[in-house]
């Protein structure tokens, strides 16, 4: 009898395989074979490789939700803790994470790019919630735009950060949050 697999098991195994093949070289048939399941069983859980990348980013979101933000005394500290936990969740596979994004950005993958924009928007909304940011009206719009820029800038820098424990990215995050505060957007 074949044991059913869940998406998280697939993500774990896909990451292991992609360590050898690169993300682009990862084949769903090879993933199924490595788990001793047939492709039909795999297709019940994921219908395309990008769903595995999305599940990987879902893990980062979950890590962010599970972070104890009570240690943050204000919105800026909570924001920093939330973003750090999101990045830390991806850190074990930083290079593969970058490869996943390259895959999404290929010219023929416009549908994946649109979904990626929605994911960024969703993550930014959660960051606002978790940090307790409560601006409304035009202040909220400015806050969301600035937070989107902060998040994507830090994330893109993190993708290429080779410093020990991504210390360069953490410095960039602190500087970006300081700018966010100076603009009066951290309320």
Predicted regions mapped to residue ranges:
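N-terminal intrinsically disordered/low-complexity leader segments
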Residues: 1-5
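Hydrophobic alpha-helical connector segments
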Residues: 68-96
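Secondary-structure edge/capping motif, primarily at the C-terminal ends of alpha-helices
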Residues: 67-71, 100-104, 158-162
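Short, basic, alpha-helical segments at the C-terminal edge of helix-turn-helix-like DNA-binding modules
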Residues: 57-64
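Helix-turn-helix
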Residues: 9, 13, 17-55
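Amphipathic alpha-helical segments used for helix-helix packing
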Residues: 90-110, 121-124, 128
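Amphipathic alpha-helical packing segments from all-alpha helical-bundle domains
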Residues: 109-133, 141-152
